[in-house]
UniProtKB/Swiss-Prot annotation:
NCBIfam families (UniProt xref): greA (TIGR01462), PRK14720.1 (NF011309)
Family: Belongs to the GreA/GreB family.
Organism lineage: Bacteria, Pseudomonadati, Spirochaetota, Spirochaetia, Spirochaetales
Keywords: Coiled coil, DNA-binding, Transcription, Transcription regulation
Residue segments, region GREA: 741-901
Task performed by this protein: Necessary for efficient RNA polymerase transcription elongation past template-encoded arresting sites. The arresting sites in DNA have the property of trapping a certain fraction of elongating RNA polymerases that pass through, resulting in locked ternary complexes. Cleavage of the nascent transcript by cleavage factors such as GreA or GreB allows the resumption of elongation from the new 3'terminus. GreA releases sequences of 2 to 3 nucleotides.
Protein name according to UniProt: Transcription elongation factor GreA
Disulfide bonds: none
Length: 901
């Protein structure tokens, strides 16, 4: 068929369509199918733009032309499914005239292109009218997947499957309740809530997750209503512990709920009926007093339960203790560092915390260290469980703090933690605490992993965190995955791609995620149905800003990597994008692809980055690390490149000290120091240029930066010394040769590390614990007679004084490289053998600083009176001096540098 024939046929059809009302009544299914054939011809012959122009002019004259609306509507819709206005107008005209067969056909044609919500809802209406009940579940399912706001059909699906497939029914009830929560429809929430209580009452934790979301989104009053519904069910079962948790949940939200307090006392009596003094504990804790804060009185009640003979307790200062005796006045506790300590009940309630026998702190106190460390290393799951249960909720940093260095080294932790992370991800007993960021809780009831992941996905609001949950779910091994949950997560990203009105980083990220699914699951990838006109080229054209802004907006490194891959796979002008990206997003694949295409272009890029190294620090560091892999001529000397790198290094230290973007600065610092030392860049450059002055300048530039990490400074010095063994550094003149200078005091690296650890412990542990002690003691009143308060205040004064002293010492300390110590004269870092001419015996001393001084071990500070009198003496010198009216006479026999292990 020629172009002319197709256009002529179109003109003929449009003329027939002139009198709309008559045409609508006379339209048949055959006529619509004839239009479908014409539309296919128009697309095949590339006449879309011409036909849209013709139809546009026609519709100005005949606004309700069926043919004009349908042909133009389908052509536009096939390009961009969101633009369905003309087709909806046709559907509306036929619906008014009860042409349901035609409406059904048009809806099905639209659905071949995209899951159009209006078409789906219209088909559901038609099937219901025609009593085609067998078709309804299928169309309801498609509506639920296409319309995340639907609450009608998701509930109908759940009800439909109740007697056919209960697991599928529960899945849709779960989906329904989250949608009702999002819409804040309390009647729907309660209806579905009742169903979930009936069908999955054994999954108590899923109810708590839903309640947390309701409290957050709808307020505590609505949450209480659902708590009470849950109580009505659990109170009639044998689940006493869960019932108590429900009542505690109510009272945390509504402190003065009298009925809940009464019921709580009733169930506590049942739960602890075997405890001898349970009634006394209930009375003493005053748990039914509505004027008292529930959380406080319940904590008191729990403490009374635990203050029984043989139970363990914890005190901020005295650590773990065991209750040895209980009487009417209080308890006697044997602490690790304080035996037989009597504490009155009032003080015990505020100062002590109960510990279970399986608490990690108890295990540390009562189990031999080697035995406990061995079990922790071998039974990782047990160790994680013990630590999490000890603290109720804890993150990986907290777990590390509990284990390193007390039970394992840092290097052991590195491998141990990798296995621990996998267990936390896969084991259904370990659940993320929605109330605390990155914290885990232990769930005695094994959660269904599918439901656990689904609940996490639904509760999470952040796009990129949802992506991480989705990918984790895709990667989980050893379980049968729920098809509906997997598709629900997948659909979240599909909606972004197929139903956007404006392209943002979420849309592009979703496209990248969907296109890269083959890396994880071919089966899942086969279910991805992206609209045919949506591709990376069209998305980037519609993105309102440039590719650099897009990369900055994408908050996931894996998505960025996959986007780099897709740019080359899908775009003919990928080189332009890669050139623009490189200084901002360092990527080896990107550079190698550019280099294969045009090495000279890469050379220009590298030189541009070097010229602007202060702006493109990441790219600059990457170039220095990898440039030897490419045949590139740089416009800068090795000396210049090294000097620039040192400027980046020292600038990062200054920013860290000033807390100026310290996270990014720490990252840059680590990258540079690794390049210089670990990757051997400093050594390789100095070997080539053989410039001793440059080497000295590198070291001294770092030396004069305040708080430059001593360990790294010594590494730099050591590398330089290997290449220039006779080099003299300015800081060495401050050592103890004839030109001594006061610069605070000298020390060795290990001593500084110990002092820094002491300072950290003081700041992060001792002072905060002391503040808590003061607060608890103050709550008891009567400060004049309060011995605990006065003791804590005295300790506060001591800690403050020690803090100030330690900070000043660390600031004034200068670390000396033990490899470069001089031994021609007595000075810091030397061992001296002297003859005592009074006793006739040889005496041997190590000369170090105030931090290392230990006269009983023969270690003398060079700043002590005795040490100062030995300084600068040489072998063969005779020494005569007086200290505290005592005469000393020595002959210097031997001087040598101290050998540090």
């Amino acid at each position: 068929m020629s172009n002319v024939t197709t256009i002529e046929k179109l003109d003929s059809i449009l003329q027939e369509d002139k009198w709309t009302r008559i045409v609508v009544n006379n339209y048949s299914l055959a006529k619509i199918k004839e239009l479908d054939d014409l539309i296919n011809n128009i697309i095949d012959e590339g006449l879309t733009e011409d036909v849209l122009d013709i139809c546009g002019r026609h519709l100005k004259d005949v606004k309700k032309s069926i043919a004009g609306l349908y042909i133009s509507g389908m052509l536009i819709y096939s390009r961009r499914p969101l633009n369905d206005m003309n087709l909806l107008a046709v559907i509306d005209l036929f619906s008014q005239n009860l042409k349901w067969a035609l409406v059904e056909h048009i809806c099905n044609e639209m659905l071949l292109i995209s899951e159009n919500k209006h078409a789906l809802y219209t088909l559901a209406k038609i099937y219901a009218q025609n009593n085609e009940n067998d078709k309804l579940p299928g169309i309801w399912t498609r509506i639920v997947e296409a319309d995340i706001d639907d609450t009608v059909f998701v509930r109908q699906l759940a009800t439909y499957y109740e007697t056919i497939d209960l697991q599928k029914s529960i899945f849709y009830f779960r989906k329904a309740i989250y949608r009702f929560i999002d819409k804040k429809q309390m009647s729907g929430i309660r209806e579905v809530w009742a169903k979930l209580i009936h069908y999955v009452s054994d999954d108590f934790d899923s109810f708590l997750l839903i309640l947390q979301k309701i409290e957050k989104d709808l307020g505590f009053k609505k949450a209480i209503v659902l708590y009470e519904d849950l109580f009505d069910h659990y109170s009639l079962t044998d689940n006493v512990d869960e019932t108590i948790e429900i009542l505690k949940g109510i009272l945390k939200l509504d402190n003065k709920n009298h009925k809940a307090r009464e019921n709580l006392v009733k169930f506590l009596r049942e739960r602890y009926k075997d405890v001898k003094n349970i009634e006394d504990y209930l009375v003493k804790s005053d748990i039914e007093n509505l004027d008292k804060n529930f959380v406080d009185v319940y904590l008191d009640f729990e403490k009374y339960l635990f203050f029984a003979k043989g139970n363990f307790v914890y005190h901020q200062t005295w650590s773990v203790g065991i209750v040895r005796d209980v009487n009417d006045n209080g308890i006697t506790v044997d602490f690790v560092s304080k035996r037989g300590h009597f504490i009155g009940f009032d003080m015990a309630m505020s100062a002590l915390s109960p510990l279970s026998r399986e608490d990690i702190r108890v295990l540390k106190a009562v189990t031999p260290k080697e035995e406990l460390a061995d079990r922790v290393k071998k039974d990782i799951e047990w160790a994680i469980k013990v630590i999490i249960k000890s603290y109720k909720a804890i993150d990986l940093k907290g777990i590390k703090k509990e284990l390193v260095p007390s039970l394992m080294t840092q290097s052991s932790w590195n491998s141990w933690s990798l296995k621990a992370k996998q267990i936390l991800k896969d084991n259904p007993h370990f659940v993320m605490d929605s109330g605390k960021l990155d914290c885990y809780i232990y769930n005695e009831r094994s959660s269904n992993l599918n439901e656990k992941m689904y609940d996490k996905f639904k509760i999470e609001k952040d796009f990129y965190k949802r992506y991480e949950i989705f990918i984790n779910y895709c990667n989980v091994k050893g379980i049968v995955k729920d098809l509906h949950i997997e598709e629900e997560m997948l659909n979240y990203f599909l909606i972004y791609v197929n139903n956007f009105t404006k392209v943002d980083h979420h849309v592009v990220s979703s496209y990248v995620i969907l296109k890269s699914l083959g890396n994880f699951s071919e089966e899942l990838s086969s279910k991805v149905n992206i609209e045919k006109d949506v591709n990376l080229e069209s998305l980037l054209k519609e993105y309102p800003k440039g590719i650099v802004d897009l990369f900055d907006s994408i908050l996931n490194a894996e998505i960025k990597k996959e986007l780099v891959v897709l740019i080359k796979e899908e775009l003919s002008n990928w080189i332009l994008y890669y050139k623009e990206l490189f200084p901002h997003s360092v990527n080896k694949r990107l550079v190698e692809s550019l280099y294969k295409e045009d090495p000279r272009e890469v050379e220009k890029l590298f030189n541009y980055v070097i010229k602007n190294y202060k702006i493109y620090k990441d790219a600059y560091i990457w170039i220095l690390k990898h440039c030897k892999a490419y045949s590139i001529e740089l416009s800068y000397s090795d000396s210049d490149l090294l000097s620039n790198l040192i400027k980046i290094l020292t600038d990062s230290v200054i920013k860290i000290n000033n807390k100026n973007n310290s996270v990014a600065s720490k990252r840059i610092y680590k990258m540079v120091i690794n390049l210089l030392v670990k990757d051997g860049y400093l050594k390789s450059v100095l070997e080539v240029v053989r410039d001793e002055e440059l080497a000295k300048r590198v070291y001294m530039t770092c030396f004069y930066v305040k708080d430059f990490p001593p360990k790294d400074l010594l590494e730099i010095k050591s590398i330089i010394r290997q290449l220039f063994d006779s080099v003299e550094f300015e800081d060495e003149k401050m050592q103890l040769a004839g030109e001594r200078m006061e610069i605070g005091f000298l020390t060795i690296l290990s001593s500084l590390n110990k002092k820094q650890k002491e300072l950290k412990y003081l700041k992060e542990v001792e002072i905060p614990e002391n503040s808590k002690e003061i607060g608890k003691a103050r709550e008891l009143g009567d400060l004049k007679e309060n011995a605990e308060y006065h003791s804590a205040k005295e300790k506060q004064q001591f800690l403050t004084k020690r803090l100030n002293s330690l900070m000043l010492e660390i600031e004034n300390a200068k670390v000396i490289d033990t490899k470069d110590l001089q031994s021609s004269v007595v000075g810091f870092g030397t061992k001296v053998v002297i003859l005592n001419e009074v006793t006739g015996k040889d005496e041997s001393y190590l000369i170090l600083g105030p931090w290392e001084s230990n006269p009983d071990e023969g270690i003398i500070s060079y700043k002590s009176p005795f040490g100062e009198n030995l300084l600068d003496s040489r072998e063969g010198d005779s020494l005569n001096f007086v200290i505290n009216n005592t005469n000393f006479k020595y002959f210097v026999k031997k001087i040598e540098p101290i050998k540090f292990s």
